[in-house]
Amino acid sequence: MKVLHVVTGLAAGGAERQLHLLLRHLPDRHHCEVAVLTNPGTVAEALRADGFAVHELDMRGNRDLAVLPRLTRLIRTRRYHAVHTHLYRAGLYGRLAARLAGVRTVLATEHSLHPGMIEGRPAGRGVRALYLAAERLGRTTVAVSGQVADTLRDWGVPEHRVHLLPNGIDAAGYAVPAARRTAVRAELGLPAGAFTVGAVGRLVPGKRFAVLVEALAALAARPGGPETRLLLVGEGPERAALAAQAARAGVTAVFTGERDDVPELLAAMDVLAAPSTEETFGLTVLEGLAAGLPVLRTACPALDALGPDAAPGARRLPSTAEAYTEALDALRTAPPRRLPPPPAVHHYDIARIAAELADLYDRLGPARTAAPRPAALWA
């Protein structure tokens, strides 16, 4: 089956990196290409390096309707059997373009959905109504966690149209040699003995990285223990504010910007911290566990769905500076260690998740018809 994945952007966010990982592990019977509406970033480069075709559509803002005929032509010309969309804007334009091009095997993955939020933005009645209208153009909507599935149903998506398929992780990809850890730390300017607290994600308020700056400032005021560093992997609009906060607090913070070598950057850390309260899956937490790190986390539906023994190296905390300060203080005086990947990592093995997605494609089946009239799409 020939499948086009339509995604809003390809900066190095969790949904974008998950798409890349899925495509690398899908069975060969499915040939996949990618269309990106805007902002092709490091993930687009990585996809091309792996041999995947990436079609850039140069969308200029949320209401650039000119992208719709361009995407429709692409789908019709390259004769895809199925169209699979990722993220809100791609879901709106991608589903409609697929139907206009005569493709009926249309599905979407919902990566970031909360009761009143979608992808970190408020989802009022108008947004929800538009979402539901677009959702009707597809065959099914994939939820990456039970929390997302519940929200879809609460929004009005029928139960039979929701398919739960969690994110996956490639544990083998996080086994980084000790020598490489030393080299990466040197590249980042991290002193050999510095206790390095790391975090991965877009630099936006919802990730609550300011909590970590406060915690490290409080940690520095306590006697004993090694010097500390904060390593923030990601890019976003909060970068300047976080840098200013760190400077005022006397916290040495290293900002890597957008990177696609996350396993090596995790290897440079001594602990991964994830104080976000708004996660729909918690992929970064699983990545930290796969890398053998002790993990301090707040929201992680992926772990909450499993038993208490699924991730003994992860500790759940309130998203407060006080809680993270106490937990980090206990870790910084303990000997550095690498833990074996826990059962949770193996539960979300990417090979199994990709195989389930391939089976879903097979069940939906390639179906093409003549392009319907636009008015009929919304009936």
Residue ranges and their predicted role:
Residues 36, 294-298, 304:
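Short hydrophobic beta-strand element within catalytic cores of glycosyltransferases
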Residues 258, 277:
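Aromatic "clamp/platform" in nucleotide-sugar-dependent glycosyltransferases that forms part
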Residues 13-21, 195, 199-220, 237-243:
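A conserved mid-protein helix/loop that constitutes part of the nucleotide-sugar donor-binding site
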Residues 243-257:
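Nucleotide-activated donor-binding/catalytic signature segment of Leloir-type glycosyltransferases, i.e.
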Residues 175-190, 336-342, 374:
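A short helix/loop element that forms part of the nucleotide-sugar donor recognition site in Leloir-type
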Residues 309-322, 330-335:
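Conserved acidic donor-binding segment of nucleotide-sugar-dependent glycosyltransferases
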Residues 147, 168:
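Carbohydrate-associated surface elements
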Residues 65-69, 104-107, 114-137, 150:
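Nucleotide-sugar donor phosphate/pyrophosphate-binding loop at the beta->alpha transition
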